[in-house]
From Swiss-Prot:
PROSITE patterns (alphabetical): ABC_TRANSPORTER_1 (PS00211), ABC_TRANSPORTER_2 (PS50893), THIQ (PS51288)
Binding-site positions, ATP: 38-45
Topology of this chain in the membrane: Peripheral membrane protein
MF (Gene Ontology): ABC-type thiamine transporter activity; ATP binding; ATP hydrolysis activity
Keywords: ATP-binding, Cell inner membrane, Cell membrane, Membrane, Nucleotide-binding, Translocase, Transport
Chain ranges of the ABC transporter domain: 8-236
Function: Part of the ABC transporter complex ThiBPQ involved in thiamine import. Responsible for energy coupling to the transport system.
Family in the record: Belongs to the ABC transporter superfamily. Thiamine importer (TC 3.A.1.19.1) family.
Protein's recorded name: Thiamine import ATP-binding protein ThiQ
Highest rank taxon of the organism: Bacteria
Assembly and binders: The complex is composed of two ATP-binding proteins (ThiQ), two transmembrane proteins (ThiP) and a solute-binding protein (ThiB).
Length: 253
């Protein structure tokens, strides 16, 4: 499954860490960007891990493109994921870290190398192919992680607060890069964020989690216009819905 985004559904999924049960029954629209928000401990990262295959539901099903992927290991699922920790290999160069998205053994064909060069250029890393991760800034390391996603070319992209450690300007740059890539490739993007500004900047939809379940879903415009549940308004704060200027560069498709 490659190319344009596909729908993602968690169908009556239950999961628990010890005494904390989580239940997810939610659908994510194909080829759209959905912000997943909620208090700490509400299950945001767990939801992404269930989609990616890093966690296994105790009941219910995970469907990607209408196919139940419960039996598929993470590597076989049509998803890519970027974490807050960029998961780069310190001893590998930029181009090698990106190349892992094409071949875990780094046995690369000419087509693979062309894809890597294109991804590095698209993410602003041209000319830095031979550098090691320690020679890069935090924002550049996350660009490497995103370039690796591009060469994998999966229809679903999962973002688990990958830019949370960056300053506001760098974070905006990375969000705009994600929005630009989404506009070009049309993948389904699920991204976890605590930042209302981030959700408003690129999110078309919002899924709000509270107490280990899906408390509400809807369009980002409606949520930030006050139509979200009271728990969401408390979560973002009374003035956060108006914190982002109305003339912000919206990068949606």
């Amino acid at each position: 499954m490659r190319g344009k985004g596909v729908p993602v559904r968690l169908d009556k999924v239950s999961f628990s860490y010890g005494e904390a049960p989580l239940t997810f029954d939610v659908a994510f629209a194909a080829a759209e960007i959905t912000a997943i928000m909620g208090p700490s401990g509400s299950g945001k990262s767990t939801l992404l891990n269930l989609v990616a295959g890093f966690e296994t539901p105790q009941s219910g099903g995970v469907l990607i493109g209408g196919v139940d992927v419960g039996a598929a290991p993470p590597a076989a699922r049509p998803v890519s994921m970027v974490f807050q920790e960029n998961n780069l290999f310190a001893h590998l160069s930029v181009e090698q870290n990106v190349g892992l998205g094409r071949s875990p053994s780094l046995r690369l064909t000419e087509v693979d190398r062309e894809a890597i060069d294109g991804a590095l250029a698209r993410t602003g890393l041209g000319g830095k192919e031979k550098r090691l991760p320690r020679e890069l800034s935090g924002g550049e390391r996350q660009r490497v992680a995103l370039a690796r996603v591009l060469v994998r070319d999966r229809p679903v992209l999962l973002l688990d607060e990958p830019f949370a450690s960056l300053g506001p300007a760098l974070r905006d740059d990375m969000l705009d890069l994600v929005a630009g890539v989404h506009a070009e490739r049309g993948m389904t993007v699920l991204f976890v964020t605590h930042q209302p500004q981030d959700a408003r900047r690129i999110g078309r939809n919002v899924v709000f989690l509270d107490n280990g379940t899906v408390a509400a879903t809807g369009s980002a415009d409606d949520f930030f216009a006050g139509a979200g549940p009271e728990a969401f308004r408390r979560y973002i704060g009374a003035s956060a819905g108006n914190a982002v200027s109305q003339d912000i560069a919206r990068k949606r498709t």
